[in-house]
Amino acid sequence: MATFAKVMLLLSSVATFGYTFFVVGKLMLFLSTPRSISKAHTWIFNLLDNKSRLETAYGPIVFDTLYLIGFIFQHSFLKSALVKNLWRKLGLAAAERTIYSLTSSICLHYLLKNWLPAQSIVLWQVDVDESAPLWWTFVVTHGLGWAVIFGGSLIMDLPELLGVKQVYYDLKEYGEPVAYKSSELRNLYSHVRHPSFVGLSVILFATNVMSLDRLLLASLLTVYMYVAWSTDDKDVAYQKQQLRNKKHELKAQ
């Protein structure tokens, strides 16, 4: 009976893995699709000349802020010791990361589905449709940003990151996956659980239309990442050492 429950948990974890990829795909389209230019936009510096544009943005900005707060709260609260201890008491310690990934994906999916644009006010706008070099610059910049994020996720062990490996190891009665990693890497993972601050920040701010809602999204998520990702000197030294080791391995080949 216990084995059956673990198998069902593993299937749920695999389903969560697939759902997370689906939501991330929607996030990529949401953040990286070039936005069309509208003459109805009002430059943020001209608000005094057209205050009605600001008034029409109130509603979307309020709701979008609530969506972001909900996502950030979920992302932080489910990492707390209180919640982790709760899963442990319920016998769901192995599913902790799967539950975290699932709830994160649900919150993000809800945010993307209900996001309200506030495009009556813009900080800047660049018409990339009329210029092939600008369009390719936009696409390549975002492509590189996503490549860094996905590459970093693979390096950081994507199945473990999304919780599949923990459930599988529990089914096979192995130790926790993190137990097989070095103490330096475990310390790094406790401070930064997924990449990449620079890559995601570039994607958030490198938009051809910086509307008020996009500015809100980019600013709040960047500040949250900066506060939540608390790397220390040991983490930096560890990553530098790993880079030196990798360069040495490549030269030796």
UniProtKB/Swiss-Prot annotation:
Principal subcellular localization:
nucleus
Q: Which parts of the sequence lie on the Perinuclear space side of the lipid bilayer?
A: 31-56, 114-132, 208-213
Q: Name one GO cellular component term.
A: nuclear envelope
Topology term for the membrane: Multi-pass membrane protein
Give the top-rank taxon of the lineage listed in the UniProt record for this protein. Eukaryota
| Record topological domains on the Nuclear side | 1-2, 79-96, 162-188, 232-253
Where does the sequence pass through the membrane? 3-30, 57-78, 97-113, 133-161, 189-207, 214-231
Tell me the keywords, alphabetical order.
Answer: Membrane, Nucleus, Transmembrane, Transmembrane helix
* Subcellular localization(s) per the UniProt record: Nucleus inner membrane
Q: Which family does it belong to?
A: Belongs to the nurim family.
Q: What is this protein called?
A: Nurim homolog
Gene encoding this chain? nrm
